[in-house]
UniProtKB/Swiss-Prot annotation:
The keyword Protein biosynthesis applies. This is Serine--tRNA ligase. The gene is serS. It catalyses: tRNA(Ser) + L-serine + ATP = L-seryl-tRNA(Ser) + AMP + diphosphate + H(+); tRNA(Sec) + L-serine + ATP = L-seryl-tRNA(Sec) + AMP + diphosphate + H(+). Gene3D superfamilies: Bira Bifunctional Protein, Domain 2, Serine-tRNA synthetase, tRNA binding domain.
Length: 426
């Protein structure tokens, strides 16, 4: 959530930053309501001061011996009652204005950082670096991962669709074992890098989704329970970030690093007809997530480290990838700066997103009211939160099935993964 003070004091800058994003955002209604609310607050403050003054004057006069029924005292009391009646009318009006402002501010995305490239969409994303070109397979006859998966008997779409619907898959035998090995491998590398593993709830309440920015704007993209205020998580970022919602952390405990493996659930409402086959775009998929809580002065350095932690997985698996800095037109709602890691999929000859690493600065912390306090200092500050995939497990499987495909129709297991799987080939 943006700071209303920032909107009030720098309206032109805020509007310009919002205009650089995709979508249309107008802060003028917020500014108008804010002016009304502050005027009302000023009036209420003056009336409250007058009410206090009247009470003090009446008390002094009675103390000095003037009869409480004296016309002057009675007039003061009548004025005091009138002031209190007006105050009681203004209070709900001010409360309503604050609620309206809060709802409008909740609908605004984060402001892009100065180091986020200007652009209209993903075409304007800026490539930062590539890694592993020497590992790009030269075999011209590589099958798409869903075809080789079905040939090997490790991927069954037809039966999964029978059980659920389209955009679901069932992993069988060595496929299920490969997924389990990848999850263990990723968590091991992250915990070795200093992340504390957590196993969070897979269902969260509305307040949690609002805190991380999925609600109210993206309700149609999530699965909601019909009879409860619970939603299936779209990413572990939501429950892990909300573990600290409403808390004041000690500065000496920062930074806090967490990693978590969870299934994730997304309706993919805006993706009709895209990536209908395979493991790329599913309603249910597994992912290992990294989440950080850090001091504001360190958050952009922490973003670079976060990207490095995700890259370490791809490098250990010898999977070719590139890092791109997302443009303002492709930036996620809660993020001020995002790097996407895109893995090479030879069957399509394209790089595809496998990780998204974002710095939300104080945007989520402000919505979730997560603060920290330095010892010996007054007041608190909002922490900065970061999150990143480390990695999307299904997409990592897809990349292995294609990049490690052999001419004889088998798939070699990456050397780093072999101890976790107990085999060298599928």
């Amino acid at each position: 959530m943006l700071d209303i003070k920032q909107i009030r004091e720098n309206p032109q800058l805020v509007q310009e930053r919002l205009n650089s994003r995709s979508g249309k955002y107008d802060i003028e209604p917020i500014l108008q309501l804010d002016r009304q609310q502050r005027e009302l607050e000023g009036t209420r403050s003056q009336l409250q001061a007058r009410s206090n003054e009247i009470g003090k004057i009446v008390g002094q006069k009675i103390k000095s011996g003037i009869n409480s029924q004296d016309p002057e005292i009675q007039a003061l009391r009548d004025e005091g009652n009138s002031v209190k009646a007006t105050l009681s009318e203004l209070e709900p009006q001010e409360k309503d204005l604050k609620a309206q402002i809060a709802q409008l501010v909740l609908a605004l995305p984060n402001l892009p950082s100065d180091s986020t490239p200007l652009g209209k969409n993903e075409e304007d994303n800026v490539e930062v670096r590539r890694w592993g070109d020497e590992y790009i397979p030269q075999n011209p006859n590589i099958l798409p991962h869903w075809e080789i998966g079905e040939k090997l008997g490790i991927l069954n779409v037809e039966r999964a669709v029978k059980v659920a619907q389209s955009r679901f898959v069932a992993l069988v035998g060595a496929g299920a074992a490969l997924e389990r090995a990848l999850i263990q491998f990723m968590l091991t590398l992250h915990t070795q890098a200093g992340y504390l593993e957590v196993s969070p709830p897979l269902l969260v309440n509305t307040e949690s989704l609002t805190a991380t920015g999925q609600l109210p704007k993206f309700a149609e993209e999530s699965f909601k329970c019909a009879d409860d205020d619970l939603w299936l998580i779209p990413t572990a970022e939501v429950p892990v970030t909300n573990l600290y919602r409403g808390e004041i952390l000690a500065a000496e405990d920062l930074p806090i690093y967490h990693c978590a493996f969870t299934p994730c659930f997304r309706r993919e409402a805006g993706s009709y007809g895209r990536d209908m086959r395979g493991l790329i775009r599913l309603h249910q998929f597994n992912k290992v997530e990294m989440v950080k809580f850090v001091e504001p002065s360190t958050s952009f350095d922490e973003l670079e480290k976060l990207v490095g932690n995700a890259e370490a997985i791809l490098q250990a698996l010898r999977l070719p990838y590139r890092v791109v800095n997302l443009s303002t037109g492709d930036l996620g709602f809660a993020s001020t700066k995002t790097y996407d890691l895109e893995v090479w999929l030879p069957s399509s000859g394209k790089y595809r997103e496998i990780s998204s690493c974002s710095n939300t600065i104080d945007f989520q912390a402000r919505r979730a009211d997560i603060r920290f306090k330095e010892a010996g200092k007054k007041g608190t500050q909002f922490v900065h939160t970061l999150n990143g995939s480390g990695l999307a497990v299904g997409r990592t499987m897809a990349a292995i099935l294609e990049n490690y495909q052999q001419p004889d129709g088998t798939v070699k297991i990456p050397e780093a993964l072999q101890p976790y799987l107990g085999r060298e080939v599928l």
